[in-house]
């Protein structure tokens, strides 16, 4: 089972450190940002320590790296041309880094239309993706299902389908299915996940799903908030998320936890991933999990 989490990539070790952290958490896959998600400062490819990273991965049975594009990319912006242009250029360079890292998919938030309306946002995203997907490689852009917070585009399956249909090289587009976002967007992930998946299949096709983000939600269905919660401690609940993780449809697909670190002290929060992954492998909810995470 391909199950992992977001891990850090920084310092001199870069990918080597990411692979070590993923192994420490008992993971078989992992997701990284190539640098800080809120800025465009990036190390050159030759400083990402890729060879060492792959050696660690091979030694510990890790595979299927997933890359996440930074939040600052907004190719749905029709108001500020420089924001759109920066997004296109930076996404192109992130795809080069993704390919160098040996990853197949780079997850992208489709963007926000900043008040100009969904149609304008979708049109701009299509324009941007058509510019980006001319480079000759096999990296896919995995459009993420969004919660519908603010002016986010991709808040329902129909919006993602419109983007995919408008892109010329859409064989290079996949989908990252986020359980928290989809729940927050109003889909019944908790009680009828197969129904949600069937709807997705009719509108987009489940074969497009190449990454799953496994997150509980701090808010009730349809809240359009996007606030992740630890597995089993939110409104989706353990049973539903355990069902998603062990679903046949996602057997060969990386399932990535992006659940929050635990603890009141901001400087001393603990990563939940090792124990959450163990719990999902055992398929039994541990209501004392947060205390155990704090005691790590």
Swiss-Prot record:
Assigned EC number:
3.1.21.2
* Sites where the protein binds Zn(2+) 1: 68, 109, 144
Q: Which reaction does it catalyse?
A: Endonucleolytic cleavage to 5'-phosphooligonucleotide end-products
The record's annotation in PROSITE patterns points to: AP_NUCLEASE_F2_1, AP_NUCLEASE_F2_2, AP_NUCLEASE_F2_3, AP_NUCLEASE_F2_4
Q: Extract the InterPro entries matched here.
A: AP_endonuc_2, AP_endonuc_F2_Zn_BS, Xyl_isomerase-like_sf, Xyl_isomerase-like_TIM-brl
By its UniProt entry, which SMART domains does this protein fall under?
AP2Ec
Q: Name one Pfam family in it.
A: AP_endonuc_2
User: What enzyme class is recorded for this protein?
Assistant: hydrolase
In terms of Gene3D superfamilies, this protein maps to: Divalent-metal-dependent TIM barrel enzymes
A GO BP entry is: base-excision repair
**Which positions in this protein are listed as binding Zn(2+) 2?**
144, 178, 213, 258
Cofactor binding annotation: Binds 3 Zn(2+) ions.
The membrane spanning regions, by residue number, are none
Residues binding Zn(2+) 3 are 181, 226, 228
Molecular function (Gene Ontology), one example: phosphoric diester hydrolase activity
Q: Which UniProt keywords apply?
A: DNA damage, DNA repair, Endonuclease, Hydrolase, Metal-binding, Nuclease, Zinc
Tell me its cofactors: Zn(2+)
Under the heading NCBIfam families, the entry gives: nfo (TIGR00587), PRK01060.1-1 (NF002196)
Family according to the record: Belongs to the AP endonuclease 2 family.
What this protein is reported to do is described as:
Endonuclease IV plays a role in DNA repair. It cleaves phosphodiester bonds at apurinic or apyrimidinic (AP) sites, generating a 3'-hydroxyl group and a 5'-terminal sugar phosphate.
Q: What is this protein called?
A: Probable endonuclease 4
From the broadest rank down, the organism's phylogenetic lineage runs: Bacteria, Bacillati, Bacillota, Bacilli, Bacillales
């Amino acid at each position: 089972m391909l199950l992992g989490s977001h891990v850090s990539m920084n310092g001199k070790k870069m990918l080597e450190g990411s692979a070590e952290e993923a192994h420490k958490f008992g993971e078989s896959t992992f997701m990284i940002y190539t640098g800080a998600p809120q800025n465009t400062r990036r190390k050159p490819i030759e400083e990402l320590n890729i060879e060492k990273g792959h050696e660690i991965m091979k030694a510990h049975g890790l595979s299927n790296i997933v890359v996440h594009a930074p939040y600052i990319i907004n190719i749905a912006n029709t108001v500020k041309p420089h924001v759109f242009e920066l997004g296109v250029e930076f996404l192109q360079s992130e795809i080069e880094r993704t390919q160098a890292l040996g990853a197949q998919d780079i997850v992208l938030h489709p963007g926000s239309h900043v008040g100009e309306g969904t149609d304008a946002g979708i049109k701009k995203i299509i324009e941007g993706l058509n510019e980006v997907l001319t480079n000759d490689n096999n990296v896919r852009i995995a459009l993420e299902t969004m919660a519908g917070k603010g002016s986010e585009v991709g808040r329902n399956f129909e919006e993602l389908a419109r983007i995919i249909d408008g892109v010329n090289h859409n064989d290079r587009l996949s989908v990252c299915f986020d359980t928290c976002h989809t729940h927050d967007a109003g889909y019944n992930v908790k009680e009828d996940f197969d129904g949600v998946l069937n709807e997705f299949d009719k509108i987009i096709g489940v074969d497009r799903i190449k990454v799953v983000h496994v997150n509980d939600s701090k808010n009730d269905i349809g809240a359009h908030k996007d606030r992740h919660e630890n597995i089993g401690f939110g409104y989706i609940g353990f049973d539903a998320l355990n069902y998603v993780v062990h679903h046949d449809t996602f057997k060969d697909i990386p399932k990535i936890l992006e659940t929050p670190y635990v603890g009141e002290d901001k400087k001393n929060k603990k990563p939940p991933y090792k124990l959450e992954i163990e719990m999902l492998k055992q398929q039994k909810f541990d209501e004392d999990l947060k205390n155990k995470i704090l005691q790590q």
